């Protein structure tokens, strides 16, 4: 579960290293974000000499959470970290590579470009 003020790792090569969630996109009073949800975040740490800079406000989609995800078939998936992928307004990733495993639920939510770049889909 991701809520405002939560720090997340960045799972792509867009230039950002760490994000902080400042808003969960959805209903006006939505508190938590789960895998596949879009958030508004601020960059807390960035790689030098890249297009993204520190304190820049961006959109990101959650790809991994430490909170377990229960599927309809009873399988429970839990990751080691909270991670997100930086996206543009159309939902396309800004980076060209994705690091680490991502959940299969992203394909059902029309993030097919992110799924195709991922090395492992669980």
Curated annotation (Swiss-Prot):
What is the protein's major site of localization?
A: plastid
Q: Where in the cell is it found?
A: Plastid, Chloroplast
Q: Which SMART domains match?
A: Ribosomal_L14 (SM01374)
MF terms from GO for this chain are: large ribosomal subunit rRNA binding; structural constituent of ribosome
Q: Which keywords appear in this protein's UniProt record, sorted alphabetically?
A: Chloroplast, Plastid, Ribonucleoprotein, Ribosomal protein, RNA-binding, rRNA-binding
Q: Does the keyword rRNA-binding apply?
A: yes
Q: Which family does it belong to?
A: Belongs to the universal ribosomal protein uL14 family.
Subunit description: Part of the 50S ribosomal subunit.
Q: What is the protein's given name? A: Large ribosomal subunit protein uL14c
Starting at the broadest rank, the lineage of the source organism is: Eukaryota, Viridiplantae, Streptophyta, Embryophyta, Tracheophyta
């Amino acid at each position: 579960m991701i809520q405002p003020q939560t720090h997340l790792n960045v799972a792509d090569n867009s230039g950002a290293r760490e994000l902080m969630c400042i808003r969960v996109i959805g209903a006006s009073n939505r508190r938590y974000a789960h895998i596949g949800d879009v958030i508004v975040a601020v960059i807390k740490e960035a790689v030098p000499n890249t297009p993204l800079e520190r304190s820049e406000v961006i959109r990101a989609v959650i790809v991994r959470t430490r909170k377990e995800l229960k599927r309809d078939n009873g399988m429970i998936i839990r990751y080691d970290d909270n991670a997100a992928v930086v996206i543009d307004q159309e939902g396309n990733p800004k980076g060209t590579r994705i690091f680490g495993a991502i959940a299969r639920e992203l394909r059902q939510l029309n993030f097919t470009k992110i799924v195709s770049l991922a090395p492992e889909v669980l």
